[in-house]
Every structure is written in structure tokens, then in C-alpha cells.
Design a protein with these regions (language model features):
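Long, well-ordered, tryptophan-enriched scaffold segments
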Residues: 106-185
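Cofactor-binding active-site loop characterized by glycine-rich and histidine/acidic residues
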Residues: 1-95
């Protein structure tokens, strides 16, 4: 992470002394500009900051010495339940927002419960509707390797069809739970 976070803090993510689950200017050592949480305010803030940056540049309100900034937000899938995010997306579409990247961690987990199964099929569609270019990075190298093995396509289909409630339970149970479910099915 460009030298802003230690390996130790990342390995102890969400643990005592580890990196926080939500960016925090008071608890993290990196250069977080907008703290966020489960209400999605920091996510929307990046979009509006990009719009304001363009406005200041176009109206020549600054001295022009600052390079154009990039607004990047790391978003949990559960945050997509917040209405202000969709209001922000619509405003971004109306004002042709630029220099903005949102990385959505679709991990099917939420501190408030299990993420709705129907959400995954709509996420990309919602962003594309308001003019975003969506790049999906769904599987890691280990899964891609497993999919290339005999019966790998069946594994891919099983993972894709797995309801979020079962997926969350298996994540909690760990490797033994996954092996039992995959062997059974």
C-alpha cells in the first residue's frame, strides 16, 4: 500500500493494534482524507470532491498550482444499502464526474447482517446505468487455478449460486465447513 500501512497492521486487520475496518484519521497511520463508516458518507464525499475540484479548476478559482487529484474510495458491499450513495451517483452522472474510482469489496459480509442475495446481480448494472465503466475482479489466482482443474466449472457455478446466508456461515466455519459443504453438494 505504497508504504502507508505496515504488514503487521494488515495481518492484524480489525484486531487490537491492527488496521481499522473503516478508514479513520484518528486510528490509522495512513493518509486518509475522509473517514467513512456503514453510512456511506465518505464514499459520497469522494464523488462530490471530484465535482468541486473540476468546478474550481474550470472557474479558475485556485492558483492552478495543484495537480488534479484522484478520488478513490474503498466501499464495502453493505454500504451500497445507503441511499446517499445513489443520490451521489445520480449527481455524478448529471455533472460528468471524473477522476473517481470506487473499489467495491463484495464480500457478502456486513456488521449489521447478511447482504441481500439479489444485490450482487445488480451492482454493475446500477453503476453502468449512470455512465461508470465497471471492471469486475471476482476471483483470485487460487480460485482461477481451481477452476482450471477437472470439475472446476462446477466449483465456479457452486460459488456463484451459493446464497449469502450460507456463504457467510461457511466463512465463519472456516476450511472444514467449506470442505463439508462442497463434498456434500
Amino acid at each position: 500500500l505504497f508504504g502507508h500501512q505496515t504488514q503487521d497492521k494488515l495481518e492484524r486487520f480489525r484486531s487490537q493494534g491492527g488496521a481499522q475496518s473503516y478508514p479513520s484519521r484518528t486510528k490509522d497511520v495512513d493518509d486518509v482524507d475522509f473517514s467513512t463508516g456503514s453510512v456511506g458518507l465518505g464514499v459520497a464525499m469522494t464523488l462530490f470532491s471530484s465535482i468541486v475540484q473540476d468546478y474550481v479548476r474550470l472557474k479558475k478559482l485556485g492558483d492552478g498550482a495543484q495537480p488534479t487529484g484522484r478520488m478513490v474510495a474503498l466501499v464495502g458491499d453493505a454500504e451500497l444499502d445507503e441511499g446517499n450513495i445513489f443520490e451521489a451517483l445520480l449527481e455524478g452522472w448529471k455533472h460528468d464526474v471524473r477522476n473517481l474510482w470506487w473499489v467495491i469489496d463484495y464480500n457478502r459480509q456486513s456488521l449489521d447482517g447478511v447482504v441481500n442475495d439479489r444485490l450482487f446481480g445488480r451492482v454493475a448494472e446500477m453503476f453502468e446505468l449512470v455512465g461508470w465503466r465497471v471492471v469486475t475482479l471476482k476471483y483470485g489466482r487460487l480460485l482461477e487455478t481451481a477452476f482450471a482443474q477437472p470439475d472446476g466449472e462446477q466449483l465456479r457455478q457452486w460459488i456463484d449460486a451459493c446464497p449469502n446466508s450460507l456463504y457467510s456461515a461457511l466463512v465463519f466455519k472456516g476450511g472444514a465447513g467449506w470442505r463439508e459443504a462442497l463434498t456434500r453438494d
